[in-house]
UniProtKB/Swiss-Prot annotation:
Annotated Pfam families: DUF1283 (PF06932)
Polar residues composition bias: residue spans: 39-48
Region feature Disordered, mapped onto this chain: 38-61
InterPro entries the record matches: DUF1283
Keywords linked to the UniProt accession: Signal
Family statement drawn from the similarity comment of this UniProt entry: Belongs to the UPF0482 family.
Ranges annotated as biased composition (Basic and acidic residues): 49-59
Protein name: UPF0482 protein KPK_2871
First and last residue of the signal peptide: 1-28
Superkingdom: Bacteria
Length: 113
């Protein structure tokens, strides 16, 4: 029994040693360090295409921004006009919400309060 236990320990030690030798021999020699900056031809081409697409959509973005700014200006002017119409001393002036104008009650014409 004691003999078989020694054989098992010996066999286990030999297997462990051979596994260490086998794995150490399978590693590649790493005496060089290669550092890539990520600046490859493919990444430059992709960046160029993204820049081109951004430039192509620039005029569209500017149009959308101008339209939004015009709508905001129109709303702002209408709000000020409504406020002025309601504060007017002219009792015949009233605010027409559909046309966003200050009108005279008697004539229906636009007035400047």
């Amino acid at each position: 029994m004691n003999m078989t236990l020694n054989k098992r320990w010996c066999l286990t030690a030999i297997l462990a040693l051979s596994a260490v030798v086998y794995t150490s021999s399978s590693f590649a020699a790493t005496d060089r360090l290669v550092i890539e900056s990520g600046d490859s031809a493919q990444s430059r081409q992709q960046a160029s295409m993204e820049k081109e697409q951004w430039n192509d959509t620039r005029s569209l973005r500017q149009k959308v921004n101008k339209r939004a700014e015009k709508e905001w200006d129109k709303t702002d002017v209408a709000f000020d006009a409504q406020d002025n119409c309601q504060k007017s001393a002219n009792v015949n002036a009233y605010w027409e919400p559909n046309t966003l104008r200050c009108l005279d009650r008697r004539t229906g014409r636009a007035i400047n309060p």
